[in-house]
């Protein structure tokens, strides 16, 4: 109001529009402050703002910088988060200094700069949390590399395997997500500051200097693309939907394993919840939390993709993303932290898992393999023969022995075969079958231990990178504030 408009926003617009934008303030506050400080410094260094007014502007910005995000007086009636900061700045240093904060940039620029800074750090934190989960699974799996278990498909007993091999089934997708977030984080290394409206500015603003002040190694070259690019954020949300799906699969499988019918795993009490009505129950509440996040992450991606269908340079895009991205980053980190804690804290009942493997005929495929390798039957025929043996056992009971298999071969294929008793005994032993896997990545104990070491090493590498990235960002932020204090004479 006071320029192009003759009236302020309606109550309805404040509630539906500015309320949403102001709500993004706390999550973006620190990065918005860094954006404002860098812009003021660039204006002063470029000669666009004299030292006296520049120092006054910086003093006011440093005062705002010292306010904790949730202590700042965000007011939707004032407008978005930048307008709230601008009002507070004006109250502290007056319009003669505060009025220069928007020289050479629209108010959307500090949001774009802030969102990139928040996203880059959040991706590092999410990568670290996911790597902690994969590391926890590898730690659980290694001592159980040779412990017998039954693998399941369609919730039906399938083949003999080991507990360690089953646990690693969850570790690799989670680790890939951690490594994916590390790669995607590189898309936010370019600075979008100093581009003016959308085609540059006549103000003496050095974009490369702004990038340096903000800790970016390069600039996003095209001015309009820099200001409005949304595809990197879609990749972030896609990555979270993928990572959440992997964690949801872990949670769903684990809930089945925790059931009384399976009894393979027991969650730690700290990740469980009692029933308000039935005192005997120990509910795996943490797993429900994880699955809920997966649904939210998928919905977030869908909402963003739908919103981005509007044309280029539309306010819709970041009206959504300014709030959605920080929330998604926080949810990804804390959900992965919970999943890592669940993985590290769960107790595995190896005796029950072995019992399941020995009670179910999980060696059927191995017996078929043995027949094809030691008799005249081809594999497909051997498969049919063993299928007939299983059906006969289900209908009539009894043990599976050489005579029964030979009779089935004659009935199914008209073949006369002699089944080696020693070969059959070995093929019927699930532990022997699980160990007899020569391929890379199999359930062979040495292969499982090697995979555990690989997951542990890659997880540690991601965590080390994340810690270095977070530390580098903090160092850059402190250097920026030190420069601001120097120019402000503080």
Which sequence ranges carry the predicted segments?
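Glycine-rich cofactor/substrate-binding loops
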Residues: 1-35, 278-490
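Glycine-rich cofactor-pocket loops
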Residues: 142-164, 265-281, 312-319, 346-359
